[in-house]
Amino acid sequence: MPRSFGQSSRVPRVLVVTNMYPDDQNPDFGTFVQEQVEGLRARGLPVDVIVVGGKRDKWSYIDGARRFWRQIRQQEYDVIHAHYVFSGVVARLQRGVPLVVSFHGAAEMVGWVGWLCRLLAPWADEVTVTSAVHKRELGRQDAHIVPCGVDLRLFVPMLRDEARRRLGWPDDRRRVLFVGIPRPEKRLDLIQAAVARLQHTEPGVELVIATGQAHHRIPLFMNACDVLVLASDQEGSPVVIKEAMACNLPIVSVDVGDVAQVIGSTEGCFVCKRDSEDMAKKLGLALAFGHRTQGRQVIERLALEKTVDAVLEIYESIWQKP
């Protein structure tokens, strides 16, 4: 198991470059990157973060590149870790510090962005991907499969009635939960159509859209709802599925990314077709299941601590090279 660095005479320093990171305006944007950073810091590693691009216009990458160069001139680093391809391009503008690039899934592998990913991958010292399929698509055979982990200390089961009381919700509805930013590729339209179809036979069902919520509040929503739904066109290894599993929340999802592998044969969790009729049918089955799942037992292998272990092993392999 990788060591912590608190007792080291010289502690290696890491710079994380990312286009996704939570802020006051977008508290749920890139929380999995923040969790990994905090996990590394908890092991004793000094980690600085540069946010480039993100939700701002594309020209903001130029400003981000300037801030990146200013930072590496002011501070010496032992490794630079970039999340997503555009951050990786910015980080590879320098050649003096080893670079790890984490590619985060199928959405990056489409069209010209996918071409850019495959172009960048050989220029990184180490690469992480979310799944074996993602590794094959990227075309780098020595890529490390490191799916984002779930914080099992934050995402814990609690009584549904207590969660609803804390949210001020009445207890006369069954609730379908969507978590995330409703961008077109998240297919909220499909979810809404499926819930509307289900309401013809189950009028007490409603859709809850949890957008713009602070990350620490998401477990409350998951424990207060009856089923999580995911309908994205593209995902790599969606953290929200693992978070729902950690809360023992039933799940209905399209077959995207590694969802089918993560939920496995967990009772109360269903993979549906990408149409409103089958999604409504599977939502009905999840609601009829009537209680919480055993998802937490299944997901323990994907705990955040294990992801941090894997990242540290990659860093150490770089630092041990002559």
Predicted regions and their residues:
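Conserved donor-binding/catalytic core segment of Leloir-type glycosyltransferases
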Residues: 15, 141, 170-186, 192-195
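Short His-centered aromatic/hydrophobic patch
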Residues: 82-87, 103
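Short alpha-helical donor nucleotide-sugar binding micro-motif in glycosyltransferases
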Residues: 121, 220-225
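Carbohydrate-associated surface elements
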Residues: 133, 149
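A short helix/loop element that forms part of the nucleotide-sugar donor recognition site in Leloir-type
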Residues: 156-169, 292-293
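Aromatic "clamp/platform" in nucleotide-sugar-dependent glycosyltransferases that forms part
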Residues: 233
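Short hydrophobic beta-strand element within catalytic cores of glycosyltransferases
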Residues: 241, 250-253
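Conserved acidic donor-binding segment of nucleotide-sugar-dependent glycosyltransferases
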Residues: 265-277, 284-289
